[in-house]
Amino acid sequence: METIDSKQNINRESLLEERRKKLAKWKQKKAQFDAQKENQTSRNDIVTNSLEGKQTTEKFTERQERVKEELRKRKNEFRKSDEPVSVKPSKKKSKRSKVKKKISFDFSDDDDSEIGVSFRSKEHIQKVPEHDNEKDPLDEFMTSLKEEKMSNSKGMYDRGDILDVEDQLFELGGTDDEDVEDNTDNSNIAKIAKLKAKKRVKQIYYSPEELEPFQKNFYIESETVSSMSEMEVEELRLSLDNIKIKGTGCPKPVTKWSQLGLSTDTMVLITEKLHFGSLTPIQSQALPAIMSGRDVIGISKTGSGKTISYLLPLLRQVKAQRPLSKHETGPMGLILAPTRELALQIHEEVTKFTEADTSIRSVCCTGGSEMKKQITDLKRGTEIVVATPGRFIDILTLNDGKLLSTKRITFVVMDEADRLFDLGFEPQITQIMKTVRPDKQCVLFSATFPNKLRSFAVRVLHSPISITINSKGMVNENVKQKFRICHSEDEKFDNLVQLIHERSEFFDEVQSENDGQSSDVEEVDAKAIIFVSSQNICDFISKKLLNAGIVTCAIHAGKPYQERLMNLEKFKREKNSILLCTEVLSRGLNVPEVSLVIIYNAVKTFAQYVHTTGRTARGSRSGTAITLLLHDELSGAYILSKAMRDEEIKALDPLQAKELQEMSAKFESGMKKGKFRLSKGFGGKGLENIKSKREEAQNKDLELKKNDKRSDDLEKKINNPHEGHDSEPESSALIPRLNYELFKESTDGSIIFYAKVYINDLPQIVRWEATKNTTLLFIKHETGCSITNKGKFYPEGKEPKNENDEPKLYLLIEGQDEKDIQLSIELLEQKVKEGVVKAASLSLKSTKY
């Protein structure tokens, strides 16, 4: 039995061993088969991937070439196009952020990293071969992203946002994302567009056929006025603060509201609700002139009723026109103001006349206010817009200029025009005027009329009538002028505190007397305004006064708009309140209760003094203006000595009056020697010194006589700022005049204007200043004219020998509008003045030991 069992075990073990060997052989063959299969699969994958990569690369290269070709075409079109494009910086930021998000989802495979993946193009996604039937989650994500983007862009367009230049430029290659090179090219184009067209409105050329006719002349002279003789008219104008008229065809002045032919509702509002009595001098002459449809320049002191002078004719012209249709936004009348405070004040006056008439709507558009509400009101349609130039430019450039149409504007008003130009709004106003129909009626009101403003009026207004009121004394006769001379800042601040305490004690006495008389007597409300020269001084004085127990309402441009508005409302609401502010409110603020103005920092210009003192004595009220002078503020003393009336100087302390005259004489003597100069408020030329240096080198004896003459002329100009406009400006004799010829040429039915400005004989530095690239680029940017250097330079005493020789050096200015040519020449003359200043400074430096 044991032998049999052992044999069975041996057979079993041999069988197991044989099976193990077979299993091992099978596993080996299986492993070899799997290895061969895996190698074959990998080789097939490599071949497939290489083919797919090659196809993708070829497709990408082909698309890239197509995009670049389109980009080059668009660049060429962009260079040829003269139409400016509005650009909104916030859109560019959002565009960049979107591009960054898309790049973050790119594949990181090494084989495809150089190619990149386009996520916005369905066409490109569909061309990628699919290896299975499952839907790619990346495709789903990008499809939803694209739909979301389209809905967002549509929503933004509906809200009237600006169409971004980059949105148009990035569409050159279909809807695919561009690579880094394409994005760089597009960003460069966007930058060029920004530099060329940021906040620049498109000039509109109107043909007579597309302009809707409108009526300008509504004035019918009453029998009483028409029966007046020329002698009676002259006597009436003399009695009305010596009205001076320039221009032809000016209507006769009126003396009663009933002579203007106003409607019954307007007459009731003026006489019974607003309690307007007789007409002011500017209203007597300006209202008939504007109602006759003439362009008017009104020059009158502040607080003389200029707003009503243009508001009544504007409302009458708007009512006579066809109402706005459903698809028209308007406006028909445009009023431009230098500050938001003045714009809000004008808007309030408009509201008084239109609140009972639903057919006339008014919108106030100023910076610092919410633009969304302004846009909503404009979309509903408005007949009158009161705006600051900067905000109106913003609105005109919204939605590529499609938000607001200027086609219906027939009446344009520039209130406080000298301040508009003093704040540097001339380029914006020029752009706005190019969008308005040429047969508009334009009215310009100002307290002063400098040469720069005169030049603008000549270009824009058509045969205007100039009305000047009280030209021999621009300071309101109801303002009592005083001053105090201090020898330190501490002494000046002590004088300020003393003036405020004296004012408070006076009001307490008056109030106690009123309390003892009757309960029906109104409480005295006499407000005060303190003007300082800077924001830092305003904050510093406010804190010092608060420490002294004096509460003020401080306002300056550095404070938030809401805080400024709140302080201004508090000043108007509280009785006997004190306003501390900078020059931001030196014009246009109308608070009739102001009885005292304190000029803490001496003014630098005569125009500034006129407007600062004009904050008191509004209408027929009286007021006091006190200037605190330091002993070294000579220019302020000179302005005061020329502005104050003789009876006011006689009423002063003799010692103070003597010191004022000494300071004024010292400044006047310094002007003769070129040591001092009086700023004109519009940048000041300061060229008297240049002339004196030039003539001193030529003839010292003649220089003394001409200095005396210049001093007399300057004194005359201070006493009578507008009388000097009849003669040639003083500065014109001090600067080399630009000789030029203006030509008009018609070719192929188009009219081209060009001018030749001869610069060969100008001094070298002046010639360089006028012909350098920055000057020419600046003029091209401002006017759109083409400027080219022509001819060659000939030294002094040499001329071209014959017609074949090149002419003397000159600048060729070409443009489509004669006014643009004139503006280019004026800008060139300003650069010539800068060159004269440089030449004079170099000459003075070369003579120093």
Curated annotation (Swiss-Prot):
Residue span of region Disordered: 28-138, 689-731
Keywords, comma-separated and alphabetical: ATP-binding, Coiled coil, Helicase, Hydrolase, mRNA processing, mRNA splicing, Nucleotide-binding, Nucleus
Domain of life: Eukaryota
Keyword Membrane: no
Positions of the Helicase C-terminal domain: 502-661
Main location as per UniProt: nucleus
Molecular-function annotations in GO: ATP binding; ATP hydrolysis activity; nucleic acid binding; RNA helicase activity
GO cellular component: nucleus
Residues annotated as binding ATP: 300-307
Subcellular location: Nucleus
Subunit and interaction comment: Interacts with the U2 snRNP and HSH155.
PANTHER family: ATP-DEPENDENT RNA HELICASE DBP3 (PTHR47958)
Function noted in UniProt: ATP-dependent RNA helicase involved spliceosome assembly and in nuclear splicing. Catalyzes an ATP-dependent conformational change of U2 snRNP. Bridges U1 and U2 snRNPs and enables stable U2 snRNP association with intron RNA.
Protein name as annotated: Pre-mRNA-processing ATP-dependent RNA helicase PRP5
Organism: Saccharomyces cerevisiae (strain YJM789)
